């Protein structure tokens, strides 16, 4: 029983951190879509991280790419499409973020390569995707990873953002290390990128 409580408290802590980041990113993305200075500032931090993740996941033009948690500034899905020429389907479960993000992609003339949909990572159909990205602000991460473990292609790659080894700890405590192998962990400013492969 004690171990179960540790799993629950660990998962709760991870999800609370992700919720806090969700609200932080809403504020930053709102500023970035309204004021070019903030967009440049945000992309100065984000772009090198996204480029590294694209390389880690070995994304090519042939891959079907799925991005969970695009927010109102879908900079990662847009960069993936621009850098690899892959088509990216991206979702957000916040209706307002989805609507603003969809309009932003349209304004940038990327609607043919970046498809923004309203959806939730805990139940979205993912079986056709080759590469799946999970943003740092996605929660409940435990339910999203369980959904992926049951429904993704066997050879799919998952690029998941986390904080201070929280994804590795969660995989251990949630008994998902039987399902996922952590292939690469990369340290970024404020975050980590985890490349997960299904065993």
Located regions from the model:
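Conserved SAM-binding loop of SAM-dependent methyltransferases across substrates and taxa
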Residues: 72-84
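Conserved SAM/SAH-binding beta-strand->alpha-helix loop
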Residues: 94-96
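Conserved beta-strand signature within the Rossmann-like core of class I S-adenosyl-L-methionine
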Residues: 155-167
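Conserved class I S-adenosyl-L-methionine
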Residues: 62-72
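Conserved SAM-binding loop
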Residues: 101-102
């Amino acid at each position: 029983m004690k171990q179960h409580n540790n799993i629950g408290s660990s998962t709760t802590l991870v999800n609370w951190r992700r919720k806090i980041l969700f609200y932080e990113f809403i504020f930053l993305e709102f500023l970035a879509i309204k004021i070019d200075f903030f967009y440049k500032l945000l992309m100065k931090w984000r772009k090198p991280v996204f480029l590294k993740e694209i390389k880690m996941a070995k994304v090519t033009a042939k891959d079907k790419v799925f991005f969970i948690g695009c927010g109102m500034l879908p900079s990662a899905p847009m960069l993936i499409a621009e850098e690899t020429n892959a088509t990216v389907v991206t979702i957000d479960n916040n209706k307002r973020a989805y609507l603003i993000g969809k309009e932003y992609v349209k304004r940038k003339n990327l609607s043919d390569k970046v498809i923004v949909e309203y959806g939730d990572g805990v139940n979205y159909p993912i079986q056709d995707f080759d590469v799946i990205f999970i943003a740092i602000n996605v929660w409940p991460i435990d339910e999203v990873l369980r959904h992926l473990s049951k429904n993704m292609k066997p050879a799919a790659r998952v690029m998941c953002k986390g904080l201070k080894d929280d994804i590795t700890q969660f995989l251990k405590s949630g008994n998902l290390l039987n399902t996922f192998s952590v292939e690469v962990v990369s340290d970024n400013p404020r975050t980590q990128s985890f490349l997960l492969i299904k065993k």
